[in-house]
Amino acid sequence: ANPFILSLGSKETATRRLNLAQAFNPMGSLSGMAVASFIVLPQLWSDRRDAAGKLLFSTLSEAEKADIRLHDLAVIRDPYVAIGLVVLAILVIIAITRMPKTQTDNAELTNVRATLSNLWHNRIYREGVATQMFYVAAQIMTWTFIIQYADYLGIDKATAQKYNILAMTLFLSGRFISTFLMKYINTRRLLMLFAIGAAICSLGAIFIVGIVGLYSLVGISIFMSLMFPTIYGIALENVDAKDTALGAAFLVMAIVGGALMPPLQGLIIDQYQVFGLPAVNASFVLP
């Protein structure tokens, strides 16, 4: 879908179009978090506690536990059924909609070896793939460990999840804000300014111990908002139409960075202190 969006108009506005299209992705993530936090979790009987805060589930008979499992399964199942129906409806709409022809549809096919050679010798593309890999790693680390950061401050997990929702809300808002700003500010310059903002917030998350540090961590999300689609668009700017499909595939594969780096951050968090800082704070040196 991303190469399709890039090819639908002029190259000058391609990255802006992609940012606008990608602005709808966080809506799904935010909706999922909201459904889990405000609809699913409060209805789970297995999570009920007594006045002392202890789970009641372990004190029940096997028959009562079986009833609770069936109830909780239904609570969790129903949202997925609804999502499946919505996805099916979207699939039908796409199937019956005539898509416009694009530059990539008319491009001549070339062999894989030639395409790989073209991509490898394109410096902007090559650096774009590397940048995308490290960006995705930073994004996943930032979001994965918000709850651990809040937990260190004595904030319970239910409240900590709300900070996750706040981060995703800022991320969603940032996508629309950055799309608007691209009308007036050069795409590369805007990417640089947002990267500086993310770095400043990261320093706050590392060196400020307390609630201000937590808000700094959450604030990184607004600056991350434009990065994936903008890096993607810039990397493919000078790629020939015949090489776009494979080039786009490597950019998507760059998300492997999100799987490689979080375990390393987890190892740092497992330490008590690092250079005089709480380990959870120091771990954000990585992103």
Model regions and ranges:
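Juxtamembrane intracellular "pre-TM" segments in multi-pass secondary transporters
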Residues: 100-128
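Intracellular juxtamembrane helix-capping segments at the cytosolic ends
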Residues: 1-10, 225-241
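Structural signature of the two symmetry-related core transmembrane helices
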Residues: 189-204
